[in-house]
Amino acid sequence: TIQWPFFLKDPEKGIINEHARDFYNDVIDTILHYHKKPFVSLEHWDIPAAFLKDFDGWCDRKMLEYYRLYARRVFECFADRVPYFFAFTEPNIPIDNGYMDGIWYPFTHDPKKCYQAHFHKMVATAIAKQEYLPFQKKYHGKLGAMIHYTPVYSRSEEIRDVIAAYYADLLQVRIYLDPYLKGSVSKEFMDVLKENDCLFTYEKEDLKLIHDYRIDILGLDYYFPIRVQARETDYEGVFHPTKYYEPYIKPDRRFNADRGWEIYPQAIYDAGMRIKKDYGNFDWFISENAV
């Protein structure tokens, strides 16, 4: 991953830190020396601290043009040798942890800001593809994204459990699969956000960008599934996706006690079949998988 705060010494003006550029050039050249293909991500959670301090990071539209400038600088420096770029690695993690679950900075539960930030990352991915196109035509590389993939399984085939799984999938999985692979933010997704007073603001041009500039390849970071059941109690309080479901612990699951994660290899096959069935057999690979 190229670290945005390290690579640009002035992220507002797009001024490159020459030491950082030389460091990444050395890494890329070393990978090529050993006849390997470098896969380079533009963002794996960290952004310039000033952007968080001054305007709340990805919650603000200002990030879109700053990210455009950053992506352009990365491509200018490395596109001649890097065949695979990725706009984001696990774009949802810092947003969900910071603005929905409140366990990372800024330690808040603000669903409106959360989904605004998610949407801006969807648009930023399209912007990265737009900026990459001239380099793609010259060097024939690909621009993708790597998502934190948590496939959803219902406790049973009982209708209430199936509906719970539908909402978990819509809000936790399709949130990025649909814009990345179909070029659209689903109406069902937007309807749920609107119903819960946390629909993001957007411009018509944003949706056109998402539609017109889609990724070329998808990376799946898979560690564990999400198992859900229908809620047994009514949800109260500020909106959270679990308004529509509760976690379900499968009694006979294989379990990594160190991490607290279920081990379920079948999900990788299921992911491939889902992408084949629902997303036109899109080009994908396993980008992370471990316990």
What does each of the following model-derived ranges do?
Residues 11-12, 25-291:
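Active-site region of glycoside hydrolase catalytic domains
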Residues 1-24, 30:
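Active-site-adjacent substrate/metal-binding segments within catalytic domains
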